[in-house]
């Protein structure tokens, strides 16, 4: 259900291969720390269509919004400039490392890192799915989620899309 909901939030149709790949990633969430540049790029490559796989943080300006009519977009958010991403992401990763050794509650840790990540939108595609994956990753790695269990993060967000998009 979590995999299906994660794709459904973004109105992305999925197939068995994409679903299986995402399930395999979710199974790694409790075993590996994905909050470093190389792992985030690898994660992005695994969850997006291969045509949209990145080899680094994005190099063009990104916007979050919606199509309101043909060739008409409503911009909700202008992401940080590409030239700022390396330092912003390095700061986020350093903060993750500090929180991991500083006794910060896993829910606060996961929330701060996931929000920081989606705020920066470092990739052209996959940022929302990665942000939700990071919640699972941090909660599992720091012992908040019981082994073998997964909280329905995406399913909960899907229940109230207006709040999720706010």
Predicted regions and their residues:
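FIC/Doc superfamily catalytic core
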Residues: 1-166
């Amino acid at each position: 259900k979590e995999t299906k909901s994660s794709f459904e939030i973004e109105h992305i149709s999925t197939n068995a291969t994409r679903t299986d790949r995402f399930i395999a990633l979710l199974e790694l969430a409790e075993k590996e720390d994905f909050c470093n540049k190389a792992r985030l790029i690898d994660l992005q490559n695994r969850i997006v269509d291969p045509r949209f796989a990145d080899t680094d943080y994005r190099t063009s300006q990104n916007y979050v919004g919606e199509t309101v009519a043909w060739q008409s977009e409503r911009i909700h958010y202008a992401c940080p400039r590409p030239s700022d991403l390396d330092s912003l992401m390095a700061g986020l990763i350093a903060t993750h490392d500090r929180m991991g050794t500083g006794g910060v509650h896993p829910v606060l840790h996961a929330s701060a890192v996931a929000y920081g990540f989606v705020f920066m939108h470092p990739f052209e595609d996959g940022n929302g799915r990665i942000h939700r994956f990071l919640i699972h990753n941090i909660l599992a790695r720091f012992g908040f989620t019981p082994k073998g269990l997964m909280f329905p993060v995406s399913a909960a967000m899907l229940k109230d899309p207006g709040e999720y998009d706010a």
